[in-house]
């Protein structure tokens, strides 16, 4: 693990120090034996040892005010700890706040559409359901041309349900 020690004149206690540790999820013991008050865990659905790592890490996280645990990931099928934690969060069975961000909220995911572009029936349904514009639909077309619709829906899902069902 890499560790950065931080001291700051802005801390109330001038002798206080904080640290930032960076682990990779490649080792099943990553994060074990630590007591983080803030943990940002990235691409959790793709960890090889997700259950073991999270079990060890979660035991060290104090249940106190100011503690934050952020788990974020592209979905990787309806399986694994990320999926289980997501499902439980949606059902209100844990303290996590489920947040899904669809591809079309990203301003960069659009291309100027050609004049006279005609939408397919499926594209018309997407426009209606998600209030998309033709520039977004054209960007989507170009991405689908790169790798197919299945790959697009896996990497750029429109709903959480689609993210978990299409991937993996």
Q: Each PLM stretch: what is its role?
A:
Residues 7-10, 50-168:
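Non-catalytic, compositionally simple segments
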Residues 2-60:
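Conserved RecA-like ASCE ATPase "motif II neighborhood" in helicase/translocase motors
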